[in-house]
Amino acid sequence: MLGIGKKFPNYSLTGVVSNDQAKAFQNFDANTHKGKWRVVFFWPKDFTFVCPTEIAAFGKLEKEFKARDAQLLGVSSDSEYVHLAWRSTKDELKNLPFPMLSDIKRELSSALGVLDAEAGVAQRATYIVDPQGVIRFAYVTDLSVGRNPQEVLRGLDALQTDELCPCNWKKGEDTLKAA
């Protein structure tokens, strides 16, 4: 798995940004959000059980991420057409405020080292990428375990302080001073 301090790989992926088929698809690459923080999270498959709970939870926090100049990008190995069908039929995904990217060739998940070879899908990986394109946070759970988007937001807050942040630190609390 590509880790902290490494450059996030280049990518060129098609994403679903709307339920209106005429405006549904948009291309995204590593330069699309250049100069911004990115939160890139992977889920294994569309039309499953744990995945929509995570995606919807990230969607509910999108304004919080945006307020921190961070772009959410959700990714799976399903095609953009499968993403559109799922998004159009699953109530909690219908109005997602961030793109659902298709890594159908599994190039990005492979480059990051988060492709589960046995299952043929991406692991539940989350990356926070700084404005220079460097990985600053990496978090992976088992395929059966959903992650906590609130913790990802806390991690972003901590990274953006550029200070020492203790366990369970929250935005607005004191950071540590090295003595």
Predicted regions and their residues:
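Chalcogenol-based redox active-site neighborhoods
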Residues: M1-A179
